[in-house]
A protein has these predicted regions:
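Short, charged, solvent-exposed linker or helix-capping segments at domain edges/interfaces
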Residues: 105-110
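Non-catalytic interaction-recognition regions
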Residues: 2-104, 115, 119-580
């Protein structure tokens, strides 16, 4: 249900019917095919909806636009419509004003839709995957993971609200160079525990965090010096598997605490073990996109990207200046690169599991990888340009009292997701991290815990709790929230009442916009605006002590606002507490 679109459609219908009637009577030239464009004026003094039909049609009619508008108005019937009046404005705009039927139908429609309010079928029948966080399982999750987690999870919810069949996935990088580095780092700490700190040099490019020391200590307590004298591969495998067996469950627990659950944790190692990476590289070779050099197998990345750029209208000279480079798929030692595995993983998403659209949430530092991966999908015939979308998110800066915060007060280490959740409520974390992905965000730790109107999540939750308190108080006096059909909604004529209903009607369009732009922060901004509209209504329109029909109508409106506030908060993964 989208009452704004319904009103716009009715403006078009009324305008078209008036034109047909006037043309049939010979008052306007017949055969003018102009689709009435309908907008919502920025200034409500100009009506609730406006159309530029007369301006567009007047030229073809060879008439003055205001004359066309007056003729249409004279032949327009508003009976049983959502509108009470239509006026001419400016050079020939027709401005329509809503009547009580639209306001009553909006409240009634929200009641009928219930928790499904805001749902639409824009993406119905489409199978989407959202892959997000996918942090290396070699250490604690950081603030970029925290932001990506909220963005991915909330975007998935918004896409579901728009009718898509959505799959949430975490890609576990449990193979390749970073796991070898992980094993060597654990090995060095393991040796140091047994032989002494100075007996073994730590790898310069190793993982230096205290978490590596803690994992090595736990491994030693479990296994003793059992792996001291065995062959290196056996020791590395044992250390890496132990580290992953500790880190991955902890990641799952932290993300669950954060309100994030996945449909699947997909392991990179499974692509290697099944031979799918090798099969994918062979598929690229069979299509003529690889070559051998210096004992390694290379992907013709530069050719793939150049072909795409030519399709976009770039000249060969401009392409040459970009300095495009090819990528190694298989090293001279026979090991596949991370890029080869990533290509195989995305081929699996499309060719094996059949997703229509794949959305990856990445840090902005991966921007150079976007075109290469899309190009690889194109080379495999999987239309990466249109089926693979990458949302790049900017960095996060934590601040407190105007100062940048880098270390946890409790641990003295770099702040991890665990540290953040220990200090800041989950609702605040999810709210603040759900910001526009392309903007660098500043997370104010002090603001996130404030209990006043400056904190947006508190402001919205307070509006919800305020309504819950009102409903309970009136119930104690014998007034229960009526069904829309039983309330006299025609008494809701105050500007603040109408403004609140108009704001409630915006919600379905906001959901669609958030899904279209891959930007769920539209929901946050909407909720703040809705809370503000409710507070204005509540402060201007007394409920207690009014005549019963007015009291019940306003109570119904307040409860409708409560339902939509909860709907939106649930959509972005925040709670709606009944008490504050």
């Amino acid at each position: 249900m989208n009452m704004i679109e319904s009103a716009k459609a009715q403006v078009r219908q009324l305008t078209a019917a008036a034109y047909d009637k006037a043309a049939a009577a010979g008052l306007l030239p017949a055969g003018i095919a102009v689709e009435p464009a309908v907008e919502i004026p920025k200034d409500t003094a100009n009506g609730d909806y406006t159309t530029t039909f007369c301006l567009a049609a007047a030229k073809a009619m060879k008439m003055n636009p205001r004359q066309v508008a007056q003729t249409l108005i004279d032949n327009m019937t508003l009976t049983d419509s959502y509108f009470t009046s239509v006026e001419i404005a400016g050079p020939g705009f027709m401005n329509f004003r809503l009547g009580e039927k639209w306001f009553a139908d909006t409240v009634s429609g929200i009641e009928t839709a219930g928790e499904k309010y805001g749902e639409n079928d824009t993406l119905a029948g489409r199978k989407y995957m959202v892959e997000f966080v996918s942090a290396n399982p070699t250490g604690p999750m950081h603030m970029g993971n925290a932001r990506g987690g909220v963005l991915g999870d909330t975007l998935a919810s918004v896409l579901q609200k728009s009718g898509a069949d959505v799959w949430r996935e975490f890609y576990v990088n449990d193979a390749g160079n970073q796991i070898e580095k992980f094993a060597k780092s654990l090995e060095a700490r393991y040796f140091q525990i047994i032989k002494g700190e100075d007996a073994v040099e730590f790898p310069e490019d190793g993982y230096h965090g205290d978490d590596i020391r803690e994992l090595a200590q736990a491994f030693y307590e479990n296994e003793g010096d059992k792996y001291l004298d065995c062959d290196e591969k056996t020791r590395h495998d044992a250390l890496a598997q132990f580290g992953l067996s500790v880190n991955i469950p902890k990641m799952k627990a932290d993300l669950a605490r954060y309100g994030i659950q996945y449909d699947q944790w997909f392991f990179e190692s499974s692509l290697h073990d099944s031979g799918y990476v090798a099969d994918t590289v062979q598929a690229l070779t069979d299509r003529g996109y690889t070559y051998e050099k210096d004992g390694a197998l290379w992907l013709k990345t530069s050719d793939i990207l150049a072909a795409q750029l030519r399709q976009e209208g770039k000249s060969d000279e401009a392409i040459e200046k970009l300095g495009l480079k090819d990528d190694v798929l298989c090293r001279a030692n026979g090991f596949y690169t991370y890029f080869a595995a990533d290509i195989a993983y995305h081929r699996n998403k499309f060719a094996v599991r059949g997703f229509d659209k794949v959305i990856n949430i990445w840090g902005a530092d991966h921007h150079g990888h976007v075109a290469r991966l899309k190009g690889a999908m194109d080379a495999l015939g999987l239309d990466g340009q249109h089926r693979l979308d990458i949302v790049l998110m900017q960095l996060v800066k934590l601040v407190r009292d105007g100062e940048t915060v880098r270390m946890s007060k409790r641990t003295g280490k770099a702040i991890s997701l665990t540290d953040l959740l220990d200090e800041i409520p989950v609702d605040a974390c999810r709210w603040f991290f759900n910001a526009k992905p392309e903007t660098q965000m500043e997370f104010d730790l002090g603001l996130a815990v404030r209990e006043d109107s400056e904190n947006p999540v508190y402001y919205v939750q307070y509006a919800y709790a305020r309504i819950c308190t009102l409903v309970k108080a009136l119930a104690a006096e014998g007034y229960t929230v009526p069904a829309a059909a039983e309330a006299d909604l025609s008494v809701l004529t105050a500007d603040e009442e109408k403004a609140l209903i108009k704001q409630l009607a915006q919600y379905p369009a906001v959901v669609q916009l958030a899904a279209r732009d891959y930007d769920p922060s539209f929901i946050n901004r909407y909720l703040v605006e809705l809370a503000a509209a409710f507070h204005k209504f509540y402060n201007a329109c007394r409920i207690k002590g009014e005549a019963e029909n007015v009291l019940l109508a306003r109570l119904k409106l307040a409860d409708t606002a409560r339902a939509v506030l909860k709907n939106g908060m649930t959509l972005i993964g925040c709670s709606a507490p009944e008490k504050m």
